[in-house]
Amino acid sequence: MARHISCGKLFTGLGDGAEAGQTLVLDGETIRYVGPSAGAPEPEPNDEVIDHSDHFVMPGLIDMHVHLSYGNAKSEEDIDLYAPVEFRALRGLEAAQRVLAAGFTTIADPTTTGHVSLAIRDAIDAGLFPGPRISTSGRQITNRQGLSDWYPSWIGVPETSIGVLCRDAAEGIAEIRLEVKDGVDFIKIAIDGDSMNPSSNVLVAGYDQDEMTAMVREA
């Protein structure tokens, strides 16, 4: 069963502007026709006809840097400490639904709390909830004074942090293997300092070239 969508204006992204009086015919995941309504194929008896003749229609947007588990965080501590992981998962699911409602059908989440974004991705893929396509990493791999190492040394990097402290390539490789086992789509490595950390230098690399090469090769 195909879907015939009549569009008031259609923006395909292939040209500079939107065209009026267009029809879009979708057959599953295949675009069968896109163009002037006058040349569109006639609907078959079981096809679905959708009238968006008074709407602006466009492809879904893509956002490659979204953090579903953060919420409306006011500080690093707010991200890592002030809400249990279970609440962050529910908050992240609600955020994913708002992202979809805003027109974003594909997002990437480079750093999440625990397995929050992986669980949201899997729940959406299983059809339990509406939401965008999600590609996500696990916790970001960081070194001393890097992203997520923003607490005093006597506190360290807590388990509820969005980052995991890996002090050399061996620890980074072990974390990469664990995250791959858990089903991440990609790995995030924070290789430089953090401007939010007063003791950090953003011009100093957290890993040298050999360490980065080893971790990237493993990933």
Which residue stretches match the model-derived regions?
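Divalent metal-coordination and catalytic microenvironments
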Residues: 8, 24, 29, 54, ...
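N-terminal metal-binding scaffold of metallo-dependent hydrolase/deaminase domains
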Residues: 1-43, 55-57
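Short alpha-helix plus adjacent loop in nuclease-associated cores
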Residues: 140-149
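Active-site beta-loop-alpha junctions enriched in small/polar residues
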Residues: 67, 112-113, 137-141, 192-194
